[in-house]
């Protein structure tokens, strides 16, 4: 009988939960700001964990500066993880900025702009959307 999830998937889910709690409650660094863990990818041998993060930056903060500050905490977070999760080897954490949210919003704005431009051009030419379908 096969398992519903592989061990790496279960470990990555657990790491995501634990890291989210630790970043929210235990890491006190104003340079990081609000951070969200969007995904965790664990290597097959469970030695490395690639943690994808997004930031809500305020004021002078940039995703790059927040990521640099977060990377300074990698060793201490790994040590805390080792105490919380029972694994033979605690994965080495590598934080990576996840720009999919920003890119998704950019793409959505582009589509909205194109739709609005099409509507404006149709209105200027005196045609309606129902006329477009009859051709």
From Swiss-Prot:
One of its GO terms (biological process) is maturation of SSU-rRNA. It is found in: Cytoplasm. Keywords: Cytoplasm, Ribosome biogenesis. Transmembrane segments: none annotated. The keyword Acetylation does not apply. Gene3D superfamilies: 3.30.300.20. Its main location: cytoplasm. InterPro entries: KH_dom-like_a/b (IPR015946), RbfA (IPR000238), RbfA_dom_sf (IPR023799), Ribosome-bd_factorA_CS (IPR020053). One of its GO terms (molecular function) is ribosomal small subunit binding. One of its GO terms (cellular component) is cytosol. One of several proteins that assist in the late maturation steps of the functional core of the 30S ribosomal subunit. Associates with free 30S ribosomal subunits (but not with 30S subunits that are part of 70S ribosomes or polysomes). Required for efficient processing of 16S rRNA. May interact with the 5'-terminal helix region of 16S rRNA. Monomer. Binds 30S ribosomal subunits, but not 50S ribosomal subunits or 70S ribosomes. Belongs to the RbfA family. This is Ribosome-binding factor A. It comes from Aliivibrio fischeri (strain ATCC 700601 / ES114).
